Swiss-Prot record:
GO terms for biological process: glycolytic process. The gene is eno. This is Enolase. Keywords: Cytoplasm, Glycolysis, Lyase, Magnesium, Metal-binding, Secreted. SUPFAM superfamilies: Enolase C-terminal domain-like (SSF51604), Enolase N-terminal domain-like (SSF54826). It comes from Arthrobacter sp. (strain FB24).
Length: 426
């Protein structure tokens, strides 16, 4: 039994040049676990609180020294001597120490950093890769990558309202093959954009961010790139969207493509897209508080496409339960920093899967080289992962980790492929 001997934290930088928390946990057997905490650009209002310093004279107010101090001065003394394998008790001790419903005292970034670092240390102590430590012998499914290759919304400086246009290599036989297909489409998209005189500048998550006349224009460009790469849209590679609609929901209407639309009108728009394009997934199609609209949309097209609750559910089991009870949405986006601890994240995944909801392990737009979410995706047999374009090292780090896991699993590895999207009829 390895006990927690010491916990240290520091400020490091994320992929957007903003400070974030990194934590190291030292165990009595000499093993060390490390984890860095991601940060989002478009965040749900019900997410656990990311503690920032607010000192405008330092990192423009975005420093995280308060969270670092919380780890060193409060969390570390409270957890010293805990059995590192008792993850649930460790996480609960931090939640109790914080004492708020949204982790606003210590900060979700402080609690999560410790939670993930403990898991990494315990896995090292057990001489197991993290995915096997968390998932046991059943951890063998490699996720379909939802690769964000064209950016709009708050991830880019353009007139495109939808935040992420993604490709999903559903027809591949293995993860490595699916990743290769995605890379080839990504590079073909760059060539398509260049040929049309469009910008090939990159957004936060490595996708291209051209200024386009409409959201459909973005889908058309991606389909052209898929064909140019030698693949068939809908058969080999499908499309997916993250609308992030809460970002353009103002004064009771959706400010979309120059018009103020109702939830009913937005639902009709999505139904047309699903009919016209090989779409397997639409994330946050409506505002996080528009539960009535979400229910109407789910009833209308939920049998044809994956409807993903990100801002809607914020990886919170109690909010997800409301969705399950009302048959609202049919998929959960899993972001560890939305809820702020590993065990609460695993609880949300388990609840979703038991209810027949699909699950997607996800990065944030502000990322680091930490690869923990790749292991979580395999540990939970999530079937899908969102971790950006096949560009920028903080995104590629997760893909490379999944390649290593697939190689290690060898014949036991299974790629989720088309089975990850049971509602897709394409």
């Amino acid at each position: 039994m390895a006990l927690i001997d010491a916990i240290h934290a520091r400020e490091i930088l994320d992929s957007r040049g903003n400070p974030t928390v990194e934590v190291e946990v030292l165990l009595s057997d000499g093993q060390i676990g490390r984890a860095a905490v991601p940060s989002g650009a478009s965040t749900g209002e019900h997410e656990a609180v990311e503690l920032r310093d607010g000192d405008k004279g330092r990192y423009l107010g975005k420093g995280v020294q308060k969270a670092v101090d919380a780890v060193i001065d409060q969390i570390a003394p409270a957890l010293t001597g805990f059995d590192a394998t008792d993850q649930r008790s460790i996480d609960q001790a931090m939640i109790d120490l914080d004492g708020t419903p949204n982790k606003s005292k210590l900060g979700a970034n402080a609690i999560l950093g410790v939670s993930l670092a403990v898991a990494n240390a315990a896995a090292a102590s057990a001489d197991l890769p993290l995915y096997k430590y968390l998932g046991g012998p059943n951890a063998h499914v490699l996720p379909v990558p939802l690769m964000n290759i064209l950016n709009g919304g708050s991830h880019a400086d353009s007139d495109v309202d939808i935040q992420e246009f993604m490709i999903a290599p559903i027809g591949a036989e293995t993860f490595s093959e699916g990743l290769r297909w995605g890379v080839e489409v990504y590079h073909n998209l760059k060539s398509v954009l260049q040929a049309k005189g469009l910008s090939t500048g990159l957004g936060d998550e490595g996708g291209f961010a051209p200024n386009l006349p409409s959201n459909r224009a973005a889908l058309d460009l991606i389909q052209e790139a898929i064909k140019n790469a030698g693949y068939i849209p809908g058969k080999d590679i499908a499309l997916a969207l993250d609308v992030a609609s809460s970002e353009f929901f103002k004064d009771g209407a959706y400010q979309f493509e120059g018009k103020a639309l109702s939830a009913t009108e937005m639902s009709a728009y999505y139904a047309e897209l699903v009919a016209d394009y090989p779409l397997v997934s639409i994330e946050d199609p409506l505002d996080e508080n528009d539960w009535e609209g979400w229910k109407t949309l789910t009833d209308a097209i939920g049998d044809k496409v994956q409807l993903v609750g990100d801002d809607l559910f914020v990886t919170n089991p109690s909010i997800l339960q409301r969705g399950i009870d009302t048959a609202t949405a049919n998929s959960l986006l899993v972001k560890v920093n939305q809820i702020g601890s590993l065990t609460e994240t695993l609880d949300a995944v388990s609840l979703a899967q038991r209810a027949g909801y699909t699950t997607i392990t996800s990065h944030r737009s502000g990322e680091t080289e930490d690869t923990t979410i790749a292991d979580i995706a395999v540990a939970t047999n999530a079937g899908q992962i969102k971790t950006g374009a096949p560009a920028r090292s903080e995104r590629v780090a997760k893909y490379n980790q999944l390649l290593r896991i697939e190689e290690e699993l060898d014949d036991a590895a299974r790629y989720a492929g088309r089975s990850a999207f049971p509602r897709f009829k394409g």
